[in-house]
């Protein structure tokens, strides 16, 4: 039913225009603005496949389907967003000590109730990763930590802003090093 694809070599605005012209009666949305040359699309499989071809015609270097279990960050995820909203309505989320940068808004938030709304919104909304990193840089963030195996986010951060020092935390020794660095 749903699919996602990575479009390399086109910016978010261009890919958004392509998705708007290709979807016909099906959903296809720009789902992730990862870095200046990487955008992920999400929606109905046929619409995503059509958008891949249109993106290649528009000059994309590569456009490939991603092995995902669902079309995340698009309107097809509304039932999941509704379920999340119901679950979050039953809890109290305290205001954070450190501001949260919500990737759906690319801005900081300090109100727990608003953060609950943003968590729901991100299920169907575009991930504004590039803008979030740019915002954090403008706020003076000079150090980021990617926690977990892999280097995908670290690579994106480097392509967005080479001035930010990227640290990877993936095992016991790297956790210790991060803790020492943060003290």
Residue ranges, per PLM feature:
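Alpha/beta catalytic cores of group-transfer enzymes, especially the acyltransferase/condensing modules
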Residues: 1-124
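Acyltransferase/transacylase module recognition
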Residues: 89-183
């Amino acid at each position: 039913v749903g699919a996602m694809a990575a479009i390399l070599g086109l910016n978010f605005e261009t890919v958004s225009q392509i998705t708007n012209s290709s979807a016909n009666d099906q959903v296809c949305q720009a789902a992730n603005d990862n870095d200046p040359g990487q955008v992920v699309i999400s929606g109905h499989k046929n619409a995503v496949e059509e958008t891949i071809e249109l993106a290649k015609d528009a000059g994309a270097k590569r456009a490939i389907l991603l092995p995902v279990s669902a079309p995340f960050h698009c309107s097809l995820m509304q039932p999941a967003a509704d379920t999340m909203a119901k679950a979050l309505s039953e809890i109290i989320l305290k205001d954070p000590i450190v501001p949260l940068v919500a990737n759906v808004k690319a801005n900081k938030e300090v109100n727990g109730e608003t953060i609950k709304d943003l968590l729901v919104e991100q299920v169907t909304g575009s991930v504004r990763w590039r803008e979030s990193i740019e915002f954090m840089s403008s706020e003076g963030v000079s150090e980021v930590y990617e926690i977990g195996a892999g280097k995908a986010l670290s690579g994106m951060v480097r392509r967005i802003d080479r001035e930010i020092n990227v640290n990877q935390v993936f095992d016991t020794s790297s956790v210790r090093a991060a803790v020492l660095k943060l003290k």
